[in-house]
Structures are given as structure tokens and as C-alpha cells.
């Protein structure tokens, strides 16, 4: 099954800016790998299908594991090891974003001390690398953002912190005029999720904003000074696109669907294939044939 996205034409480029190339890459997110619920088998199926499509690289939108946030070192290390072994099936360059479930031991119920050397984002950094960064590929600029900020009371908020905002502003300012930008972030910057999942948002007892980036307007203001073609997002497990100010905010469905219990609000388990063709972007959502072995329990 594949669901196609809209085609957006980029503006013309100056002589000083190399023409953007043509290639495909895959964006997948929210694997939530675990030894339960056939999750490793599902990731195996998914990664083999991605590899068979032969994209030039893949980008992972966060929530690699289930879970590191509220568990001890043994469980967190085990699910990270499981993810890293399974990821080898991709056999291609891979760029990671951090998700809330990837942060280690922050919830008090984990029993992990804040002085633990792997506490917070350190476990992710040791295994996956930096939490925010950028790179160029065939005259496109890719930006990976960190939307997960643990709080002093051992909870978390979806936010892009001040140091990162300064970095992003400088990073985009240094680009050649007209160079197309594609951003990746775990928690959405722009989404319609609160409209069709209103009861889930309103009914949740949350001290902090954990569904969408709390200071998204600050990020969007920086984006206005660059040619941001698309933002690839995860976290909600629902496939959607919102077009805002000539940027596509594409939220991909999850590899795990409804946390390995079937489709999530109509979106089956899958990933997003992004096609870039000389400054034009299109995308489609692909499923990979996973069938849950348990009845759905989560909304």
C-alpha cells in the first residue's frame, strides 16, 4: 500500500547555487522496538522492505525503543541493543533524531539517579550521535532538530531550546541563497492532530506540552528566512500533511502503528518515501505487511 503526497515546486536558483540533485530517501519513525508484541519481527519486515527500495539513505524520526524513559539501565540497554542489531538490516547511511522514549531514566519511576553516567540524552548520544545537527547532500540541506527537553521535576516538554535556536539561525543563515532545506524533528512543529484527536489532547493530564513543540513559532520564524521545502515529523503515529507558507509539514505514520497493536487512528504501520527531483519534492506512505498478533488496547 502506498499513499502519495502533493508535489511542490521550488523557486529558481541563482548561478552561485548548484542545482539540486535527484534521489530518493526514506523517513521512518517510531519503531518502539521491544522484545514483546512481535516488535522486532515487525522492524525486521520494515527494514527489509526499505532496503529493497534502495534509497540513498534513511532518516529516523525518533522513538527508536520502547522504552528508555521510565526504565532501569538493564531494560534500556537491552532495547537499544535490540534496535541496533535490527537496524543493520537497512545496510545504508542512516541519520537519527531523538524521541522522548529514547531519553534514559528521566521518569522518577525508572529508579535511575540523575547522576547516572548514561542519564538523560547521554545513552542516545553514545549510541546514535548528536541530538541536533545538519548536513548537505546533492545540494539539499538537511537539518535534524532535538524537540525533547527533560525538566527539573523529571518530566519532559516538547521544545527546541535556546541554544539550538541560535544554532539553527546561524546554520540557515550560512546557506547559499535559495538552497532547499529539509528538516526532521520528532514532535511536530505544525500538525492538525489536535483537531481530529481532540478528546485525547483535552483529556490528558499534562503539566507540560508534550504533543507538539511548545515554542514552534520561534522555529517557524527562523524558517521564514530560508527555503524550507519540508519538515518531516513523527510522534503522533498518524500520517498527515499540512501545507503552511510553502512548506510541507509531513507527519509520518509509525513503523509500530498503534504501538504494535494494529493501525493508529486509520494509519497502518509504515514509513515515508521522499523523492527529490531537481528541486521538486513528492512523497508517499508505504506499508510493509505487518499484522498484529494482539487485540488493540491503546486509543
Region annotations inferred by a language model:
Residues 30, 62-63, 99-100, 186, ...:
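Active-site glycine-centered loops adjacent to acidic/histidine catalytic or metal-binding residues
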Residues 183-189, 229-239:
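Histidine-centered catalytic micro-motifs
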Residues 17, 70-180, 206-209, 214, ...:
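Extended active-site neighborhood of metal-dependent phosphoesterases/phosphodiesterases
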Residues 1-8:
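N-terminal export leaders
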Residues 10-76:
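N-terminal active-site segment of His-dependent metallophosphoesterases
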Residues 278-299:
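Acidic, His/Gly-rich catalytic cores of divalent-metal-dependent hydrolytic chemistry
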Residues 151, 189-204:
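Active-site His/acidic residue clusters
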